[in-house]
Amino acid sequence: MGLPILAIIVLGMCGSVQKISDHVNKKFYTVMIGAIMILCCCVSIPRTAAVGIEMGLQGIWPGAPYLVFVILYFVIAFLFAKDRGTALDKVGKILTPIMTIILFILVVKGAVSPIGTPGAASVDNAFVNSFLGGYSTGDVLVSFLAAGVFFDSIKRKAYEGEAFRKAHVRACLIAAVCLAIVYGGLLYMGACVSTEYTPDSISNANLLLAIIRSSGGQIAIYGLCLSVVLACLTTAISQITAVADFYETATHGKLSYKVLVMIVPIVTTIVASFGLDTIVSLTSPWFSFFYPITLVMTILGIFEKKIPNDGAFKGAVYFTVIYAVLDLPHEYGFGFLDPVLNHIPLYGPVSYTHLRAHET
């Protein structure tokens, strides 16, 4: 929750993703963000549809035809994203308020009328597990690819200079408070049933459904499923907008935004048709490849004005890239580089693959 918002704040303070990337190499921005945009088209955006339909729509309508609703999902996303200037405004005025109100009602109900008593923790290394679990969500990656669209939306409202910085930090703080309330409420509700369920006895999705059903009955389930769909849809719209905007700039206008904003939903519809499990199994390792790089750049960005030269940026990012390249085959189950990886300090105890193996 905190890292994506921190990344947006840092990128805004530095000016843009490109400005912070230029400390590494003038071409690094195009290469890295271009690769993340491809990952976004092949993984992140299709996954929003798969999650929204499988966990949202099919949660209340198990027989819902998957492919039909994938197509409908991306048609709706296209209709919101087709106008670059108003895409985020429409999301902020229509979809996000509905989703936020529903989630607030659910967590307030769960906090006011708890369904049990919080028990002892049943997961070892909860913080590290949760932190590295962010790899598979790719939230910081989304911050890097959507930051430009977010900043452009603020500047279109005539915020410049110091006014822009204040507006963007204010927006991030409001988002942080809202997310803290929602996630804090869900964490408390989860703790209240910790004596009834163990991590091995139920999946995360079914656990969430069980908690919400116990708290508010079937009506609460409808609310949860609707909020899941809306959360996924808002994410898809912002990412489609970001991808189309980036490649219009990267191709120097040879591919227009209007053309790209139609191509992206078509590509993502095809990928999403394979289903959530296939998407995750084939592409999750790429999140663990890019996530450390963007995380290092976020940390460096915090101290940008204190770092005397670009050498620190180059050294930190290049060594992180080397580590990510070495770790990628391991994420796919190939162990031929394990002897090298095992000599990297802290690789074993805190690696994403290591912790994931202990969860299964």
Where are these regions (language model features)?
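Membrane helical hairpin/interfacial module
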Residues: 2-63
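Membrane-water interface regions at transmembrane-helix termini and the short interhelical loops
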Residues: 15-19, 74-95, 156-157, 269-281, ...
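Transmembrane alpha-helical segments of multi-pass small-molecule transport proteins
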Residues: 31-35, 59-82, 97-111, 140-152, ...
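Hydrophobic, membrane-embedded alpha-helices of multi-pass small-molecule transporters
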Residues: 37-41, 107-114, 123-189, 220-235, ...
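Membrane-helix boundary/coupling elements in multi-pass transport proteins
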Residues: 44-49, 221-250
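Inter-helical loop and helix-membrane interface segments of multi-pass membrane transporters/permeases
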Residues: 45-69, 113-135, 328-348
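Extracellular/periplasmic helix-exit of transmembrane alpha-helices
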Residues: 177-207
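Conserved small/polar residues in nucleotide/adenosyl-binding loops
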Residues: 353-360
